[in-house]
Amino acid sequence: INDPTIPAIPTDCSNQGAYNDLGGAKGIIGVNPLPYDNGSYYTCSGTSCSANNNVATAQQIVSPVYAFSSDNNGVIVSLPSVPSGGTTSLSGTLTFGIGTQSNNQLTAKNIFTSNGTEQDGSFTTTYSNGSYDSIFDTGSTELFFDTPSNQPALTVCSDNSGFYCPASTTTISTQLSSLGGGNNMNFDFSIINFDNYIQANPNSVAIPNAGATGGQN
């Protein structure tokens, strides 16, 4: 917003821009299942700012979808598959509302009930006999996770810190589960060497199978 009365942006906000630059994005909008963005906020006084994790709901950023007068119960994000070599352009659709109009019906679906009580919209992922809180987030450009202690650690990239760079493409098997059970789905995915991929595909705007450490999310 660049309000001149507000002090300098805290570095833990401004440092995030490097990942937008890497992806060639002007900006990234993330849509999650929650009506309010219960993330990190700051309270500023004079020239100093400090983190404030107790911002009243009425002062939090409202999801633009939730603010609609109708068709506000969710979104459908539809994108085509990305080839292994990436692509220089990708187009999809963002449909507002689910089951509210003739053109936003779900014909094939796996429904995962998320954890609304903790205000994070999470469900459960089982990976290598461990259970982890997980989310679907349209603003996350990679698969964020940490390697369990009972699995060989994935090599972290030297050129792009925080991303994974295994010696060869690595397949990981997980199971996704709704809150309280009720619906389970096996989810296998692969992780590429991110450094090698970027060098070979410098103009790619959609990168399949990119992984990063969970600490970045």
What residue spans do the PLM features occupy?
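Aspartyl protease catalytic domain
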Residues: 1-131
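C-terminal catalytic lobe of pepsin-like aspartyl proteases
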Residues: 67-69, 77-217
